[in-house]
A protein has these predicted regions:
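Flexible glycine-rich surface loops and low-complexity tracts that mediate binding to linear polymers
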Residues: 25-29, 80-81
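N-terminal accessory regions of nucleic-acid-interacting proteins
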Residues: 1-23, 27
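Short N-terminal binding/cap micro-motifs at the start of the first secondary-structure element
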Residues: 14, 32-35
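Non-catalytic, usually N-terminal nucleic-acid engagement modules in DNA/RNA processing proteins
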Residues: 24, 33, 41-47
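A generic structural signal for short beta-strands and their flanking turns/coil linkers
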Residues: 21, 38-40, 50
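Short, glycine/acidic-enriched capping/hinge loops at junctions between secondary-structure elements
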Residues: 34-38, 53-55
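Short, glycine/acidic-enriched loop or turn micro-motifs at the edges of active sites
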Residues: 29-31, 105
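Active-site-proximal helix-loop-helix substrate-binding element of RNase H-like nuclease domains
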Residues: 3, 43-115
């Protein structure tokens, strides 16, 4: 496996990052209820061995760099069970995430149910 570089930041992605094509996105929360539970971390992977962990302190949801990436129509955001991640990102950051690709839905569509 190739080396992975993990970058950690508070409340937003660093300014000046550029991505092309697609990024993988995942969130970590304090629970599974969108209206009740807080977004703690948003993870972004570029598929080239870099991962950014954005840790939210619960007081600053402005995240202009992360919002710009999540709303960028030229970059596909890849999720697994995106329904929850997209909802929690919209609830806390107020961003409409698009375009998206959900690997959970794709796996159900591609399933052949054969031996």
């Amino acid at each position: 496996m190739a080396d992975v570089t993990i970058h950690v930041s508070r409340n937003d992605l660093p300014a000046g990052l550029t991505f092309d094509g697609a990024v993988a996105v995942d969130t970590e929360t304090l629970g599974l209820k969108v209206g009740r539970d807080r977004l703690c971390v948003c993870q972004v992977g570029d598929g080239k061995g870099n991962a950014w962990l954005v840790q939210f302190d619960g007081t600053d949801w402005s995240a202009p760099n992360l919002k710009k990436l999540l709303a960028d129509p030229g970059i596909t955001k890849i999720f697994h069970f995106g329904r929850f991640d997209i909802a929690i990102l919209h609830h806390h950051l107020g961003v409409d995430v698009a375009p998206v690709f959900c690997t959970k839905i794709a796996s159900k569509l591609a399933r052949t149910y054969t031996d």
